[in-house]
Design a protein with these regions (language model features):
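Patatin-like phospholipase
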Residues: 1-40, 48-284
Length: 284
């Protein structure tokens, strides 16, 4: 079923994104496609294998490569400034080890919009499929979290994590004219972000980017406001929120395969449970 009036909105969350990847498996199994997708960070990474219609590809990455030091390690951070091995993730894996179906991805019947944060100007920069290119540099930028990944220089911009300004990128879908949303979150109901990063630490690491200091300081408030906005839409019958229904015991840097695979299984279950609600929302 190809939805026409309902957009898909994806939170990030690092390795908690395996929940979202499970939800996408349910969408693939039910041949559910969306006309418009907005994504940041891990959400942007994991949606790619859904768009290329490659079931269980993300799961196979976890099963075979998540403990590989090329994927995630302190060694990566020492060598490249990134704890995640982005060259391995965006080049070696899709082009050689677990081939990515670029043709199927390009044929996906909808628009993808991925945000990265311009830390010079303090604004979200959006990239569609064409702008992402074959190496997905904007997705890499969107996934580059402060302190554990270097600033990505792309097309004259200095970019970091798209979730800094658009943690739950629902507004982009509303601005595109979509009034109904499916929102995939990677936190339990009731979660609120509480603390920002101390400004003195930001000033010491990111001296050249004062806009980033303010963004990081305001991040908890911004996250909570965006979360409350989509929860309000759900109460009004304008959105379906899919999020973990069991207490999360995993953080964004957890690479224990058994925990990630269990979270993926849970995501599949939550995705299947939401299918009827998604179809009902579309038909309203």
């Amino acid at each position: 079923m190809h939805l026409q009036k309902t957009a898909l909105v994806l939170e990030g969350g690092g390795m908690r994104g395996m929940f979202s990847a499970g939800v996408f498996e349910a969408f693939l199994a039910h041949q559910l496609t969306f006309p418009y997708i907005t994504a940041v960070s891990a959400g942007a990474c994991n949606i790619l294998s859904y768009m290329s219609a490659q079931p269980l590809r993300t799961r196979q990455i976890i099963e075979h490569y998540v403990t590989d030091k090329r994927y995630f390690s302190v060694r990566n951070w020492i060598k490249s400034g990134s704890i995640f091995g982005f060259d391995f993730i965006f080049k070696e894996l899709p082009k050689h080890l677990l081939p990515f179906d670029y043709a199927a991805y390009r044929a996906y019947p909808g628009v993808l919009q991925v945000a990265a944060t311009d830390i010079v100007n303090g604004e979200s920069i959006w990239y569609n499929q064409e702008a992402l290119g074959q190496d997905f540099i904007p997705v890499r930028a969107s996934s580059s979290m402060p302190f554990v990944a270097p600033v990505v220089k792309h097309e004259g911009r200095a970019l970091l994590d798209g979730a800094l300004l658009a943690p739950i990128p629902y507004q982009k879908a509303l601005d595109a004219g979509y009034k109904k949303l499916i929102v995939v979150l990677t936190r339990n109901e009731g979660y609120r972000k509480k603390k920002g990063v101390p400004k003195f630490l930001l000033k010491s690491v990111y001296k050249k980017y004062p806009k980033l200091w303010d963004i990081m300081e305001q991040r908890p408030k911004l996250y909570n406001e965006q979360l409350e906005a989509v929860e309000k839409m759900e109460r009004e019958g304008k959105a379906v929120i899919i999020r973990p229904q069991i207490p999360l015991t995993i953080d964004k840097f957890d690479i224990k395969p058994h925990k990630l695979l269990a979270l993926h299984d849970h995501g599949i279950g939550c995705g299947i449970a939401a299918i009827d609600r998604i179809k009902e929302l579309e038909q309203q």
